[in-house]
Amino acid sequence: MQAPGHFRYDMFSQGIFVDPMPPTSRLDALAQKLHPQQSQFPLVRMGSAADGGYLVPDDLQDIKACFSPGVDTFATFETDLLKRGIGSHLADYSVDKVPDGLQALSFVKKFVGGNTAGHHVALEDWVTQFEPHAKNDELIL
């Protein structure tokens, strides 16, 4: 029989972080806060009409950069941002390079997670590394 906590140590040593499930009451409280918000700006489509596309408020003039975790092999959203002068920092451990045709500000072959270790980088560490002086309201995630 394994000692208590042995499973968590085994997972941690592989760069996998296992935390206890939060109480249901906390999850319910969070779910109550999540709902659509009306924007004062019209929405514009960025990216493809299928996977990889998003409707975003047309209020991008002060945006300095995009942080895009999970790139895959295409980046239509990031390509449309670049047409507006907004470069992207990309992270994805499952691919080896930036998608063809995209000029990225940076690419890290890592998964974005809660902690920086092994094949993972914490969001805060990633942003601090590449945009240390940017304010949160100047970035897109």
Regions found by a protein language model. Name each.
Residues M1-L141:
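Phosphate/nucleotide-binding beta-alpha loop and adjacent structural elements of enzyme active sites
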